[in-house]
Amino acid sequence: MKIIKSLILLVLFMASPAKGDDFAWMSSGLSGLKSIFGCLEVPTFTSFQEGKIGISLSTAGDWQSTGNAVEKGKLLKIKWSTAGLTPEPRKYLVLYRIDPRFSVPQVFIKTYNYKNSQFEVAGFPGFSTANDGVIPPDKNLDALSFTKMNNYVNYFNYANGNPKIQVNVGDIVNISLADKDDFFNPSTSKTPSTLNNILAKELDSSVFAASALYTESNLGNFENRIVYSSAEQVCNIIDAQRATLCTGTGSATKYTNVSNGALVGKPMAVTTLQNFMSMINSCPANSNLNANPSCYYDQGRGMVIKIGGQVIKNRDQSFVNNDNTQNGFMYYQATSGGAMDFSSDWQPTGMFNNSFSMSDWSRNFSNYTDFATYITNGNWATNFLYFGRYAMIVEIGNGTNTISPGDQKNITLEYLITADGTLPSSSTPGTTVGYDFSGDAPQDGYLWLRVKNPNSNIQGTISVDYANYTGTTWFSNIVYNGAIKPITDQFRTYSEDFYFKLVANSAIQNIAKTALTLYVTIFGLMFVLGALKLTAVEVVTRIFKITIVAILLRPESWSFFNNNFFSAFINGIDFFATNVVGATSSKSNIFGFIDPIFDKYTNGRIWGLLFIQLLQIHNGLAFIVIITIYSLITYFRAVLEVIIGYVIAFIGLTVMISLAPFFIILMLFEKTKTMFNNWISILFSYVVQPTILLIFFLLIDQILSEQLLKVIVRACWDTLIPIKIGLDLSNLGIPLNFSFTLPFLPGIPFFVPQVPDITSSNILTNDTNTFLVLFTTALLFYSYCLMSYGLVSFVTIVVGMLTQVTPARIEGNYQAPSNPTESIMKDIGSVAAPIKKAALAPARIFKDKVIDQNYEARKPQGGGEHTGKFFQNRNDVKPEQTERND
């Protein structure tokens, strides 16, 4: 009775409680109580708290909250993927500039850093000082640059590792002219961390220095132009009388550069050059040096672009004009891969009468004084003018839209657990995890995640799935930490101690030495007599056997064999068991998988609903519940078998390892080698058996979880037992027969299972919990539980067939394989028999005194009465009459 009261209280506690300040339920009728208690829904198994978060690479380095609270020592799983990432177009800022001191056009390249949102430059052959950004007072720009001339030449010839823009097959290349009048404008950062401040001053200096680098061409508002014209045509426009800027006439005309700016690609002052550019027009197609009148080239003309040596734009080809930005562009899909090259077939050769090549200067002048004298005294009048520049934005997109393996490898995910929910600083270190991480939480707290991405050209969102165990761990802690681990640790120690005693035993030592001597002697005699064919494999095999037995005799043999051989079996059991388990409470506890199972099958809501169904004796639900409960008890016994099977396998493994010295010696001779092979097979069988047993067990558990939820049905507050008072006086000759219900107590209220009646619409479907579906599901649940209970015997046979190890047999029953687990379970059953009988005693009394007792009832016809027992004779009919009827 106490048990029944406890179950009723449990069910009532699971119902929706009334509010503390609402006393309306006290005056409610039975129908009103239904809205208060509501319904008990079938629970879902949620031993894990799961979540999903998308982390944008734009927030890389910042911690993101998951909202999950984790517990120390319990499982934490994190699984993430880079499937949602795509590469940003590789973006470059390219400055193509004509400088007659170089045999090829100057090409400055900046790479766009998406993380910093700016173009950044690296690799320029600048110079540094003790105070970067400040030119020393005893030095001038020309003197500082003089020592770097050879580096400049190598830089533009790509001889010092200066990388070109790389293009892969299938890449989409988009080149557009940029509205930039300065290679170092504010949006591209003049002082990136990879470049000295002084370099920016060097490239932008307005001071003439023949040895310095420049990015300006003094084009002013006329950017993205190239001028390639004879001195005669230029002078005819700016100095037709040859009064100040020019000398000579006809083909002998020379442009006299007073400031020597033409030598560095700046032939005129800004105002003069802008005035000149305003007086000339764009060159017609196929113009050349002697175009008359002088003109300029625009829209990319005068420049040749190649990819991997293949020309994608020739010199006279124009970019397509963009009506929106008025800047030209070109679009190309690469059919071949390689480096992108910007060049021209126009050469500055013959522009000056003196030597103007920086490569010649770096070879011919060993000191700055001689060089400065040469520049000062030289005649730098030009025979033609060739100057100008193009600023371009180059974007290269991946045709397959996938990130490279290298970029993918650089992206990492970290997790952090904090004691409170305060946002951690970005400088707080985290723990890096792989794509499928599984481990125990190092502490209690809240889970945070962040992405670290050193690749600035990758965009998108990383999808992260995470889960942590929230159920109890008491069972696995008791079973593993309290019982199994002490046993396995002791047997590890016993195995090592017994091994040492065997190896140190003089008798074993003598046997091993004698066996080695006989083996070598017999081998030598057979070889001398020609009875043995020696092959390389045979020689290696025999040397290997001798070496192994020789190591066995050494004091450090345990360390050698344990580290290289035994540990594979000892650790193999735990390794395979841990890796085949999916849901577990703890990664460090190999029996953690039992905790989610016990959380499922000991759920209070489940047992409360089972008790509610148990009260439904009149419609047969009680029979279904009895089958379910008995099935669960059978399943719990199967869990115990799995645990015992693991312990026995581990003990058997340690015992076999402790006997290793005997069996290792036996591998020398063919007659005894079979015993050694059988020993190896037994070791494998002890490793494989728990693994296969777990796999089968967990598969069945998945099915059982689904079936159990189908056996249990939703229960709502209703009338459990209707109370109807009836009066029938017809037997007394009074024609009075009526019945009525009490208005204040129409029945005994309680939770009632919601089982629909079988109809023509649901008789052939199993999506509704009709009585037919519940009964068949209960039988299936019972069948699966019986299947799990017989797993140990089945797996023993399977492992025996795999490893060729014959299972041990019971004495007197040599045709039936047995296993120690079955014997242990029988012993446990015999010990628990008295407890089982005592527990069933109340049930027997209930059956004898209540179910089987005589009871009176009105005979359906004729008014007779009868009493009887179930499956017994009727008491209202005499035995003689029964025999006569038969």
From Swiss-Prot:
Disordered, as annotated region: 856-886
GO CC annotation: plasma membrane
Cellular localisation: Cell membrane
BP GO annotations: protein secretion by the type IV secretion system
Membrane-spanning ranges: 520-540, 609-629, 647-667, 680-700, 779-799
First-listed, main subcellular location of the protein, grouped into a coarse class: membrane
Membrane topology field: Multi-pass membrane protein
Listed Basic and acidic residues bias regions: 875-886
Signal sequence extent: 1-20
Keyword Membrane applies: yes
Cross-referenced InterPro entries: Conjugal_tfr_TrbL/VirB6
Keywords: Cell membrane, Membrane, Signal, Transmembrane, Transmembrane helix
Similarity comment text for this entry: Belongs to the TrbL/VirB6 family.
Name of the protein in question: Uncharacterized protein RBE_1262
